[in-house]
Each structure stands twice: as C-alpha cells, then as structure tokens.
Amino acid sequence: MGCELAGAIKSVIALSVGISIGMGFGENTQAMLITRGLNEVARLCAAHGSDPLTAAGLAGMGDLVASCGSPLSRNRTFGEILGRTGSIETTREQVAKTVEGVASAGAVVEIAHRVGVEVPVIESVADIVNGSLTPEAALQRLMEITTKAENFIR
C-alpha cells in the first residue's frame, strides 16, 4: 500500500512544484513543497498501516525527486503552465497528455480526510485543480503555515 500511495501522491506534489516554478518562485519554495509533500506521504502511509519509511525510499523520495526535478515530467510541466497562466482550462488546452496528479489530487484528499491526516500541500493542489482556489492564494496559504517540528512520522 505504501508504494501505491507514494506513487499517486508524488504526481500531486510534482504539480505543486511546477505551479511554484510557473509563478516564478525558486528552489527554496520547491524544497518546502517537496519536504512537506514527502511528510504527507509518510503520514498517509502510516495511517494506512504501511511502513512510513517507504516514503524515504525509491518509491517515495526517489520518484518524488525525479518527478519534481525533471522538466520532462508531465505533472511538473502541467503545473508550470498552470502557474504561469493561472487557468486550469488554458492549461488543459495546452497539455493534451494524461496528467495523473490532476486526476488523483481530489481522491488523495478524500483518502487523507477519511483517516484524519492533514495534507495541506495536496489539498492546495486539489483546490487549484477544482477551481476553488487560485495558485496565488494556494501558495500564500501554504506559506502561512506556522513552522513547527516536522517529524517525519507523525
């Protein structure tokens, strides 16, 4: 279950990184999104009885780094265009390929809510994709999260 969760969630996190790049944010913002996203993967794995350290392996961190770091990633590319245009419709017109993170963001949020796990990065992407939040408002919301101890498994 951990590998499956990590695979679905990395696509959503790659969207968030792409959005931040498209909006002109730099590596610090990308690192924040990847780190918090990885923490969300680990917490969801733990809540579903999987080893949360799965998130630290190739199926988690490895896939996450590849998807978030590669300009060839469909999820990151979709996010970049969305971050530049601010329009989900325009982005869908420009990207005619399947983008897993767009389809799975809402479902991952539902899974997290069922088990009581907070997933602010994933939630923000789902809100952008469903049109209830602009990329600017979503990133602002994420930046306003108070800094606290981010234990990898909690």
State what each model feature region is:
Residues 1:
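Flavin (FAD/FMN) cofactor-binding and adjacent substrate-gating region
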Residues 4, 17-21, 25, 46-56, ...:
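NAD(P)-dependent Rossmann-like dehydrogenase/reductase catalytic/cofactor-binding core
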Residues 27-31, 35, 41:
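Ligand/cofactor pocket segment of small-molecule handling proteins
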Residues 37-49:
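Flavin-binding catalytic cores
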